[in-house]
Amino acid sequence: MQNLSAKDFYKPCRYNCETKNQMWMSGIADSHDSWCDCDTPFAHLLASIFPPGHTDRTRTIQEILTRDFRKTCLSGGADATNSGMAETIEEKREDFQKEEKEDFTEEQNIEDLLAAVADAEGRYQTNQLKTQETKTNMMCPIQSKKHYKLLTQQKTLLPRCSMTGTTDGVALHQQLLKECNKTSQLIHLSNLIQTQNQHPRKKDYYQSSTTHKRKRKRSTNVSSLSAKKVHARSRKRRKTSSSSSSSSSSSSRNSSTTS
């Protein structure tokens, strides 16, 4: 019984990892409250672990956790190289910087590839615009001198902004072509309307002329009929006059014979 030690009384704790961690954090807070009255014990703890001038002061928590998970934990302080547990910090820092550089180079390579793809797409689009086929627009048929003059004036007055190689010039060229097509269509429609309006006038004139001719024919027919009637009447009168004269002559002859 005289050889009893702490090992003889030790038994493993029945709590799980979460409860143990909570008990450890509460123990840290309780021990802090026993000698300091500030409301931020864990910030006080971090400030004591990473004082000003420490190599890990400017690093993020994620970087420190990944490094300490992979390698042995370094002791804090302004002179971390003087502790026995610290290994060559400069070598570890160089390794960490190399890893950061590798990550940065990978991101830079990805950005370079994306930029190259964008440049290639732009060149392909410009080549397509340069090599696109020129569409032959079907113009409306010229039906009068005014139409011809309008078309020639449009060709001379249209400004040539740029060639078809550039993107802005192509857009302007297409807009101008659309406007020209619209104007030519409007001119064609106006000409059709004018021709449609002119045809009924010709028909009316033709109809009026035909009616006048018919009237004239009717008048000529009427005059011929009236002339025939007049001739017939004159003939009848002549016949009657001749018959009367013959009767008078016969009566005179009879009277002469009787005497």
UniProtKB/Swiss-Prot annotation:
Stored InterPro entries: DUF755, HEV_TT_vir_Orf2/Gyrovir_Vp2_N
Pfam family, one: TT_ORF2-like
Coiled coil recorded as keyword: yes
Keywords: Coiled coil
Keyword NAD attached: no
Compositionally biased residues, Basic residues: 228-240
Disulphides: none
Recorded coiled-coil stretches: 82-128
Region (Disordered): 192-259
Signal peptide positions (record): none
Name of the featured protein: Uncharacterized ORF3 protein
